[in-house]
Amino acid sequence: MLSDELKLLVGLGNPGTEYEKTRHNVGFMVLEEIARKNNCSFRESKKIFGRTCEYGSGIEKTRLLMPNTYMNESGKSVRLAKDWFNFQNNQLIVLVDDMDLPLGKIRVRSKGSSGGHNGLKSIINHLGTAEFKRLKIGIGAPSNDQQERKSKTVSHVLGRFSKEEFIILNFIIQEIISCIESITSNNWEKISTRLNSYKPDN
């Protein structure tokens, strides 16, 4: 992995044990697995309002960030981390849940709107741009009916995955980690295509 391509991985979620393993915290879950695989531990960083962890060395060092600001203020932590560690927007990847995608699907984008996601909206506002990479992880919607979906959105995203869903999610997390570990400065499009077309039974 080349240093000019990836320096900071941000997982979005809400802090606190009451939110652990909820659908909205799937970004946290990916980072926790990356940390476990690389034997690194998260530590509190008050100056950037988040928990950080780093792995690798030299030009291959990558930092992980889980904001402690709650989802709607995630951008505050991301901007502080970017400025403190002197990263550029193109060295950042945000991992986020997406209710518009079914469980088992991944969507990678190099830029774009928030899609109604408050965490992404906050990051866009604090960075002053929507031009940063984001990796959206499908969590499915509570209903196909728009009115019912709207009324159940909060309970759905703050709910936990079933045992069956966790099996699918684990495949997704491992595929994401495999791709992140192989990112270089000239294969982002290839990685994006691989993730966008991934199916858990591949």
Curated annotation (Swiss-Prot):
GO terms for molecular function: peptidyl-tRNA hydrolase activity; tRNA binding. GO terms for cellular component: cytoplasm. The record marks D97 as: Stabilizes the basic form of H active site to accept a proton. SUPFAM superfamilies: Peptidyl-tRNA hydrolase-like. The active site is at H24 (proton acceptor). It catalyses: an N-acyl-L-alpha-aminoacyl-tRNA + H2O = an N-acyl-L-amino acid + a tRNA + H(+). Its EC number is 3.1.1.29. InterPro entries: Pept_tRNA_hydro, Pept_tRNA_hydro_CS, Pept_tRNA_hydro_sf. Coiled coil: none annotated. It is an enzyme of class 3 (hydrolase). It is found in: Cytoplasm. Keywords: Cytoplasm, Hydrolase, RNA-binding, tRNA-binding. Signal peptide: none annotated. The record marks N14 as: Discriminates between blocked and unblocked aminoacyl-tRNA. It holds the Pfam family Pept_tRNA_hydro. TRNA binds at Y19, Y70, N72, N118. Belongs to the PTH family. NCBIfam families: pth. This is Peptidyl-tRNA hydrolase. The gene is pth.
